[in-house]
């Protein structure tokens, strides 16, 4: 079983959040290591943000770009970061994902502005 720190080195991680009725919703995404945990960047109005606000319970598993898991899932807790976290995680995504990361973050900033995107911290 992978640890959160090991998942931070993966290119894609499958994040599973849970609806109020307990149904799971999975999404593949980019992650960066963040201290003893990991973090990701997401638009503020997404379903995953609503579900994380409701309950910070998540699972994480290594996956490919299409969300096909290739390892065991681990339980974790997620929380929404502040603007300082958002800037730090954005820089981490640029370092880890290079030009594609920079272009993705620029597109997000142009579409949504500074406050349209959130950092989610997972531990």
Question: What are the residue ranges of the model-derived segments?
Answer:
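Short, basic/aromatic recognition patches
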Residues: 1-13
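Short, structured beta-strand-loop surface elements
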Residues: 45-123
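Short beta-strand segments
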Residues: 10-44, 58-62, 71-75
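Covalent nucleotidyltransferase core used to form phosphodiester bonds in nucleic acids
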Residues: 4, 38-42, 46-51
């Amino acid at each position: 079983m992978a640890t959160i720190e090991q998942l931070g080195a993966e290119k894609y991680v499958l994040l599973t959040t849970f609806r109020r009725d307990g149904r799971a919703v999975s999404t593949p995404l980019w992650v960066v290591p963040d201290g003893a945990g990991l973090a990701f960047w997401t638009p503020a109005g997404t379903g995953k943000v609503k579900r994380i606000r409701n309950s910070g319970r998540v699972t994480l598993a290594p996956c490919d770009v299409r969300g096909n898991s290739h390892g065991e899932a681990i339980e974790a807790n997620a929380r929404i970061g502040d603007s300082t976290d958002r800037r730090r995680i954005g820089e981490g995504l640029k370092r880890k994902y290079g030009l594609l990361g920079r272009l993705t973050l620029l597109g997000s900033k142009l579409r949504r502005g500074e406050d349209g995107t959130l950092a989610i911290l997972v531990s």
